[in-house]
């Protein structure tokens, strides 16, 4: 896009386009100075410098020693690798989620950690009219969801506390956990038993069970869950549902390169 075209855009859009223009130019060279970069992207040196300093602060750009040359860091690679991992994960999970849906007829979710929340990255809707409302991309708290608990339970306690440090606990129901101190022993239990539960903690009338999915390094990268209206949930079948989830999660984890699924 020419610089004249950029100037016709609203300021916020123009700034974003300029940032991506700089990133693209940086990606074409191992390192590049401000003068050459400003000529390539057709912006003033002061504008390029301002954007570079912001990207440097955010960790996307590095300045080479005492020189005035700049280069991209691996942070963009990390973002791209994470996106590709999610694509592979969803592709691997889809078959197993559809089988779980066939066996249970209930809503099946795949959720991943995003900062201090879970985000649903894939789902299969229940075959019943009465079912949990959700959508791909929806965010929910870690502390009140079954998936959230399994995403935290296999992490170091210091990391868990760091993730939850800025979380504002909100009581959605009478059963909602409202502090990190109360959550930590629950996470110990989740790790020991191999699954997490949401017993009307996020929404009244809703019960969820979740198990972990591991990547090739043995790190929990997602939670796989079944969600039921409480009127359709049978406590006597809890372990049967857990076994179904473990079977599916074991196969997904194997597809992701992890063959020592612990349950």
From Swiss-Prot:
One GO BP: negative regulation of DNA-templated transcription
One CC-aspect GO term: cytosol
Chain ranges of the IclR-ED domain: 89-258
UniProt DNA-binding residue ranges: 34-53
Principal place of residence: cytoplasm
Recorded GO MF terms: DNA binding; DNA-binding transcription factor activity
Subcellular localization(s) per the UniProt record: Cytoplasm
Transmembrane helix in keyword set: no
Residue ranges of every copy of the HTH iclR-type domain listed in the record: 13-74
Keyword DNA-binding: yes
Protein's name in the database: HTH-type transcriptional regulator KdgR
Organism: Escherichia coli (strain K12)
Lineage: Bacteria, Pseudomonadati, Pseudomonadota, Gammaproteobacteria, Enterobacterales
Gene it is expressed from: kdgR
């Amino acid at each position: 896009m020419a610089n004249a075209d950029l100037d016709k855009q609203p300021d916020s859009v123009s700034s974003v386009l300029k940032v991506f223009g700089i990133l693209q130019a940086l990606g074409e060279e191992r390192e590049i100075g401000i003068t050459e970069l400003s000529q390539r992207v057709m912006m003033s040196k002061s504008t390029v410098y301002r954007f570079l300093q912001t990207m440097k602060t955010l960790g996307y750009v590095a300045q080479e020693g005492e020189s005035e040359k700049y280069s991209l860091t691996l942070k963009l690679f990390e973002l791209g690798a994470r996106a590709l991992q999610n694509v592979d994960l969803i592709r691997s999970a889809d078959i197993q989620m559809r089988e779980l849906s066939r066996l249970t007829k209930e809503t099946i979710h795949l959720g991943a950690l995003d900062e201090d929340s879970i985000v649903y990255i894939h789902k299969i809707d229940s075959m019943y009219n009465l079912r949990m409302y959700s959508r791909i991309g929806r965010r929910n708290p870690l502390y009140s969801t079954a998936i959230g608990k399994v995403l935290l339970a296999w992490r170091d306690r210091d990391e868990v506390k760091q993730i939850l440090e800025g979380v504002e606990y909100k009581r959605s129901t009478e059963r909602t956990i409202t502090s990190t101190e109360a959550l930590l022993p629950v996470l110990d239990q989740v790790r020991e038993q191999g699954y997490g539960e949401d017993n009307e903690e996020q929404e009244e009338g809703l019960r969820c069970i979740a198990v972990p999915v591991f990547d090739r390094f043995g790190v929990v990268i997602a939670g796989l869950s079944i969600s039921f209206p409480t009127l359709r949930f049978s406590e006597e079948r809890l372990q049967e549902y857990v076994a179904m989830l473990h079977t599916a999660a074991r196969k997904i984890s194997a597809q992701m390169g992890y063959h020592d699924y612990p349950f």
